[in-house]
Amino acid sequence: MTSQTCQLICPGLTKYSVAWEWQRSLVQQRHNCPELADVLILLEHPQVYTLGQGAKLDFLKFDPTQNKYELHRVERGGEVTYHCPGQLVGYPILNLKHYQQDLHWYLRQLEEVLIKVLDIFGLKGERYPGLTGVWLEGRKVGAIGIKVSRWITMHGFALNVSPNLEGFQRIVPCGISDKSVGSLAQFIPSITTDEVLPLVANAFAKVFGVKLVKSTNAILF
């Protein structure tokens, strides 16, 4: 695997619509100029629900026409998910031509990043055959949904560090009704996203074989 430079951007709590526009802009830039460096954005979102491109409204437990909760339908695969403070979200903008042009491989790599982070805390992250994500003692703590166009990735993963899980009760998360959602805080009550963020960054660098270079938000504009 070729060692790549990857710019790390950590903008903190960011509106979903703003981060979504950042991703689309970064992807377009790399379509125009494939030599640009890869990017990893690590952040948190205020409360928001997102639907994958082909997601079913049946998995919502609220009326989307009432505008009670912020809701976006986006380009990623998968069903409905929920973002909120306390959940660490990662958006890798990678050119898979520099890695492997294999979506299955990419999804497993993202899972491996989260599994390695859990292992640091002595927690055993698990995969389930036929499903995408990471579970901890039967509770889903890591969700993954991606979009890849011309081998440039966007969207990514969400790790439940210490979120208020109440928001997940308004949906069938990822369309999986027989498995519950959990968080790292259920096992390590004092854990914070500030503590976990650098661990996710380091695990990402190891799994993908990249050199992370912390960048300012300026490259997003």
Curated annotation (Swiss-Prot):
Statement: the UniProt record of this protein carries the keyword Cytoplasm: yes
Signal peptide as annotated in the record: none
Record-annotated BPL/LPL catalytic domain positions: 34-212
Localisation per UniProt entry: Cytoplasm
Disulfide bonds: none
Entry EC no(s): 2.3.1.181
Residues with site note (Lowers pKa of active site Cys): K140
GO molecular function: lipoyl(octanoyl) transferase activity
General remark: In the reaction, the free carboxyl group of octanoic acid is attached via an amide linkage to the epsilon-amino group of a specific lysine residue of lipoyl domains of lipoate-dependent enzymes.
Name recorded for this polypeptide: Octanoyltransferase
Gene: lipB
